[in-house]
Amino acid sequence: MDIGILSSLKPAQSFRDNSLGSFINSIDYSDSGEYVATTCSADDTVQIYDALDPKQVHTITCFETGIEVARFTHHDHNLLLSTTKGNKDIQYVSIYDNKRISYFSGHTDIVSSIEVSPIEDQFVSTANDKTLKLWKMNQSSRCLGNLDLPSLGIPAYDPTGLVFAVACHSLSRIFLYDVRNYGSDPFSTFTIDDSRYLSRFSFPPMMPEWKHMEFSNDGKCILLSTRANVHYILDAFSGDVLSRLEDFQELPFSNNFHGGSTTFVPQGNFVIGSADDRTLNVWNLRHTFHHKGKTRPPEHRIVSQSIINPGLVKYNPRYDQLLTAGSQLVFWLPEKYALTS
């Protein structure tokens, strides 16, 4: 992957299967990179798309339970869905026959995040009840572990699947846990302090609200996305701020988005993220460990009149394809493959 390919990304296909005036809440790729799932809370629907030949292929209606977040399991035709009505279960759903396989009960408020282990049929969930729960997909009767958090948590697995992290913005801390010893205290805690930089904008300095967290494919870095015009690349072993990814646009997106306005590009040392209404930024992370604390402006900006409010961004784990979502869903391809601009 190089900047030439990323800078040539063009909208190839767009969809608006959600109602007029509504926004897509969450997006996810299947492990194979062949399918996409989106949710729209306003419509109580989950849409499934073929990613390789972009088209809508299935709709799951959730009128009785509501819908917040959808995440693929390790099977292309199975999803985990968080509900907004009733007892706030997580549902394990078969897309193929639209059946609920099992229910994961325990959260007392809406589940805001679901992250699936990269190596096994296990997942973590965080909810507005300020808890994190660890689950086995074949054991829905009770969770494997429960953590009480000081505030809403943002979870992420490292690429080995042996560690999960949970970020708590209210404390400006990230806690790291050993999956094999989840009942113990975190084995590492990072306090994220960028007061010197942030004091340029407010006093006392205010850390922008955190929105999303993910590990790089090599496990060395953590991407911490915020709701403001700066995001962070952290050392995954020390918590040090390696880079600030700076933009000069405030992001006026809905508080109901579940995901990040930035994401790692799996095949290279780049981060791509949304900027203003019709713009994406590309940051180059080259020499990140040699220039710690460096503020990085975007190396390239992608502007297209075909996108509106790209509040969610996700890169295909298997193919050179980007997904953005806001009031519409857009599939992006390098220019030589894109059908439209």
Swiss-Prot record:
Using the UniProt record, give the first listed, main subcellular location.
Answer: cytoplasm
Task: Provide the alphabetized UniProt keywords.
Answer: Cytoplasm, Nucleus, Repeat, WD repeat
Keyword Iron annotated: no
Please report a single Pfam family linked to this protein: WD40
Q: What biological-process GO terms show up in the record? A: co-transcriptional mRNA 3'-end processing, cleavage and polyadenylation pathway; regulation of pericentric heterochromatin formation; regulation of siRNA-independent facultative heterochromatin formation
Spans of WD repeats, please give: 19-59, 106-145, 252-293, 303-341
| Nucleus listed as a keyword | yes
GO CC terms in record: chromatin; cytosol; DPS complex; mRNA cleavage and polyadenylation specificity factor complex; nucleus
Molecular functions per Gene Ontology? chromatin binding
Q: Which InterPro entries match?
A: Swd2/WDR82 (IPR037867), WD40/YVTN_repeat-like_dom_sf (IPR015943), WD40_repeat_dom_sf (IPR036322), WD40_rpt (IPR001680)
Cell compartment(s), UniProt? Cytoplasm; Nucleus
Provide the protein name: Uncharacterized WD repeat-containing protein C824.04
Q: Which organism is it from?
A: Schizosaccharomyces pombe (strain 972 / ATCC 24843) (Fission yeast)
